[in-house]
A protein has these predicted regions:
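N-terminal secretory signal peptides and thylakoid transit peptides that target proteins
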Residues: 1-17
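A metal-dependent hydrolase metal-coordination microenvironment
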Residues: 41-167, 171, 263, 267-271, ...
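Non-catalytic positions within long, well-ordered alpha-helices that form the structural scaffold/packing
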Residues: 70, 136, 177-178, 254
Length: 300
């Protein structure tokens, strides 16, 4: 994520977001006791495949980042620092080489957690043009793309017409599916803080089904990011409404056979904090067979 105020927002809201998810789970349990639908069964996921370090806008150096993953007894993490216009990894070949070398050195010094060399690039326009080329991607093991401040026609200069905006978002994702070296789409449909805001329920189901079918066919992973509330905190959507709408999105993509990952999108001390992500997957009844298995990701 690229907004400059992200850390400040997270300091004030991370606890609230986690509490909202916990309260929602508590409400579901109470409803079950009253005879309504039973709560979703817990889904055991123990990876975090979208995280950041000091090589972009994260808070911690790589050695500490991996030490935290070991302390939290995660099975796997992906270090996915930003490879976007103006970022240090994109500007400096030397910095990119240093980044890869440091991940390799630190992960090789321990056996507790599987660590993947990754990056989070960004879409540059609605055609699926991207900020990371194939040559650099070939050096990586887990490549994510997002919509961010450089994504023309979506988060950058969004159309004033909400329907056109929603179509632009889906068409951008359809274009990204054609990028062979793309593994996953970061926090899909993160369009709540723009003007106009496009909420999960605003996306046309026919377009979503088209995208879901293509993601499943091309093996592109849907990133269920724990702090999705960040991307909607300026919208009129209440946190639990966001959860309910996002669950419906995930259900649609799961029905098409799309594979999912969970992530914290950690920028500070949230590594492994995927409580909301797992809640969404459980409520959407996503089977374990449609969750990424990091052990099967080839390391280079």
């Amino acid at each position: 994520m690229v907004p400059a105020n992200r850390r400040d927002f997270l300091r004030s809201s991370a606890v609230l977001a986690t509490c909202a998810a916990a309260c929602a789970a508590g409400d579901a349990t109470a409803q079950a006791a009253a005879g309504s639908a039973p709560p979703a069964s817990p889904l055991r996921v123990n990876h975090d495949l979208h995280t950041h370090t000091l090589y972009s806008d994260g808070a911690h150096p790589i050695p500490l980042h991996i030490t935290e993953a070991r302390a939290f007894e995660l099975d796997a993490i992906a270090i996915t620092d930003h490879y976007t216009p103006g970022s240090q990894l994109a500007k400096s070949e030397e910095m990119f080489e240093r980044y890869l070398a440091e991940i390799e050195r630190e992960r090789s010094a321990q056996q507790d957690v599987r660590v993947l060399k990754g990056a989070e690039a960004t879409a540059l326009d609605t055609s699926g043009r991207i900020s990371l080329d194939a040559r650099h991607a070939a050096r990586l093991e887990w490549v994510l793309f997002d919509l961010g401040g450089s994504s023309e026609g979506t988060l950058r200069h969004p159309p004033s017409d909400k329907q056109q905006y929603a179509e632009n978002v889906v068409r951008t994702y359809l274009g990204l599916c054609d990028v062979e070296y793309l593994n996953g789409i970061s926090h899909p449909f993160n369009t709540g803080n723009t003007r106009p805001a496009v909420l999960p329920a605003d996306y046309p189901p026919a377009l979503l089904r088209e995208l879901a079918a293509k993601m499943a066919a091309r093996g592109k992973v849907f990133d269920v990011m724990n702090d999705m509330v960040y991307w909607f905190h300026q919208s009129p959507l209440a946190p639990r409404q966001l959860t309910a709408q996002y669950v419906e999105l995930v259900k649609l993509f799961a029905a098409a056979g799309v594979t999912f990952q969970v992530s914290s999108d950690d920028h500070r001390t949230g590594l492994g904090n995927t409580r909301w992500s797992e809640l969404v997957l459980a409520r959407a009844a996503v089977p374990a067979s449609q969750i990424v298995d990091p052990r099967k990701i080839v390391q280079r």
